[in-house]
From Swiss-Prot:
ATP binds at G9, T10, T11, A12, S13, G14, K15, T16. The gene is miaA. It holds the Pfam family IPPT. Belongs to the IPP transferase family. Its cofactor is Mg(2+). One of its GO terms (molecular function) is tRNA dimethylallyltransferase activity. The record marks T100 as: Interaction with substrate tRNA. This is tRNA dimethylallyltransferase. It comes from Campylobacter jejuni subsp. doylei (strain ATCC BAA-1458 / RM4099 / 269.97). It catalyses: adenosine(37) in tRNA + dimethylallyl diphosphate = N(6)-dimethylallyladenosine(37) in tRNA + diphosphate. Catalyzes the transfer of a dimethylallyl group onto the adenine at position 37 in tRNAs that read codons beginning with uridine, leading to the formation of N6-(dimethylallyl)adenosine (i(6)A).
Amino acid sequence: MFFEIALIGTTASGKTYIADTLAREFDAVVLSLDSLCVYKEINIASAKPSQDDLASIKYFGVNLLSVNEHFNVELFIREYQKAKEFALARNLPLIIVGGTGFYLKTMIDGLSEKTLESKSSLNNDEIYTLLLNIDPNYKIEKNDTYRLKKWLGIYEQTREIPSEFLKRTQKTGVLKDIEIYELAWDKEILKKRIQTRTKEMLDNGLLDEAKILFYKFDHKLKALNSIGLKECKEYLDGEISFKDLENLITIHTTQLAKRQRTFNKKFQSKALEFDKALATLRMKFSIEK
């Protein structure tokens, strides 16, 4: 029968493995909420499910765009609606999985009224300084050009404090009363998993993937400045050694995992130790079925 769960966790926590295993065993549909897996050309850097997995499991949210195409959370809302419609029509469970917690939170909390991105010539530092003075409660990374321009666009068009405008115009979310499970790892063990995965990605051709991407596309594109690719660019430009490349990807991925862990505290989730996660979720799926 149809039911839905969300499976969250940091990068390298094993979310995809758990989701794919359950999908095969219970014929479940999977919606990926990952900001890199949406791109057709990024396979290794995104830790995208294998071609075999994508062929044997009904996936949504993967291989939707080219690297030079822009997207926002509305893309995932549309993919969720498609995935749910597909699963409901066939009476199948739906697993929502991904490390980009912002997308899941927006799907639960709802979107705010649309505004246009600012066309201002102000740079990131200037917009960020303005933000700190006007709207210090609005949390944006200093290097997030897209969200900074969106923030400035709201301020220019409404003359309201953007965080208050977004709260006032927020619509109902598409996800209701969904059970959320978070894969939990000891920090040191997770760091070792990240080290291992980094080495595997390099062994599997990450540098070759990066070469092709930087040859075909503008290196300033946001997707090409993601962890794994931006370090490859530095290596290919002769700025760092191969040893530095591996170390920097590991360090930056570990820092990302820390930020993800902090963000995931916003959810009312049930913690699952990885070793026990499959057994727990198998039991749930068996009962629901």
